[in-house]
């Protein structure tokens, strides 16, 4: 595998601060179009793209994404994000994130604590955290202030098929995050698409994470362009 690219920590933090549109996608094994898809989404204005294969169609058809296959997919992400000056994130797996030279490691509430993950990944790697209630948001803000995480996500805003068993706290949690976090880096997530985006922005979010709004689009680039246009008009 090629030596992973490394970005200076200050560069990563600056790019995170400017990021508005964050895409989560699986490895698209059942389609075989990962490189084409990721490049199209990034060309449309996606700022951060994350590999998250858990619960995907590919996992149902072929089984869990093995470490070697995950690293092969990461090479595609690394190449595409380098070409488009975007950030590459890995979900959950600190070992994969480090081996792949990812820019970002994203953690759920049940994953490694951020302080432990920080001991595994390189010092300049950004770390994000999912939050699902007001208490978790407040804890994430404190962790951000302490330098344990670099951003957090809030949601889901609406129920999603990627996490069918998780209740959706809705836009009330987005409003709480806007109150608690202010202009710190945080993203609303969960069921957001072009039609729902104005409601999310009205609730106080300025950054979003999407999945199906782009992964299920007939034209991923156009879908990303539509979302980023609305986001930048509000910023």
Curated annotation (Swiss-Prot):
Its cofactor is Mg(2+). Mg(2+) binds at residues 92, 111. GO terms for biological process: thiamine biosynthetic process; thiamine diphosphate biosynthetic process. CDD domains: TMP_TenI. 2-[(2R,5Z)-2-carboxy-4-methylthiazol-5(2H)-ylidene]ethyl phosphate binds at residues 160-162, 191. Its EC number is 2.5.1.3. Binds 1 Mg(2+) ion per subunit. GO terms for cellular component: cytoplasm. Keywords: Magnesium, Metal-binding, Thiamine biosynthesis, Transferase. Pathway: Cofactor biosynthesis; thiamine diphosphate biosynthesis; thiamine phosphate from 4-amino-2-methyl-5-diphosphomethylpyrimidine and 4-methyl-5-(2-phosphoethyl)-thiazole: step 1/1. 4-amino-2-methyl-5-(diphosphooxymethyl)pyrimidine binds at residues 50-54, 91, 130, 163. It comes from the Bacteria. InterPro entries: Aldolase_TIM, ThiamineP_synth_sf, ThiamineP_synth_TenI, TMP_synthase. Condenses 4-methyl-5-(beta-hydroxyethyl)thiazole monophosphate (THZ-P) and 2-methyl-4-amino-5-hydroxymethyl pyrimidine pyrophosphate (HMP-PP) to form thiamine monophosphate (TMP). Belongs to the thiamine-phosphate synthase family. This is Thiamine-phosphate synthase. It comes from Mycobacterium leprae (strain TN). The gene is thiE.
């Amino acid at each position: 595998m090629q030596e992973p690219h490394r970005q200076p920590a200050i560069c990563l933090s600056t790019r995170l601060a400017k990021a508005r549109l964050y895409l989560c996608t699986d490895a698209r094994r059942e389609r075989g179009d990962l490189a084409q898809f990721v490049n199209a989404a990034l060309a449309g204005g996606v700022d951060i793209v994350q590999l998250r294969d858990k619960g995907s169609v590919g996992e149902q058809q072929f089984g869990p994404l093995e470490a070697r296959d995950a690293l092969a997919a990461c090479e595609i992400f690394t190449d595409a994000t380098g070409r488009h000056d975007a950030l590459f994130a890995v979900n959950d797996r600190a070992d994969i994130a480090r081996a792949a030279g990812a820019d970002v490691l994203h953690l759920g509430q049940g994953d490694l604590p951020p302080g432990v993950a920080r001991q595994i990944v390189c010092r300049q790697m950004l770390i994000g955290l999912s939050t699902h209630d007001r208490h978790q948001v407040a804890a994430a803000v404190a962790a951000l202030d302490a330098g344990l995480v670099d951003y957090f996500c809030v949601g889901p805003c609406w129920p999603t098929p990627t996490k069918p068993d998780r209740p959706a706290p809705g836009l009330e949690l987005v409003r709480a995050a806007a109150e608690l976090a202010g202009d710190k880096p945080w993203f609303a997530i969960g069921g957001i698409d072009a039609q729902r985006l104005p409601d999310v922005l009205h609730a106080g979010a300025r950054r979003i994470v999407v999945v199906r709004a782009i992964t299920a689009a007939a034209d991923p680039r156009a879908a990303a362009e539509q979302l980023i246009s609305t986001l930048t008009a509000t910023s």
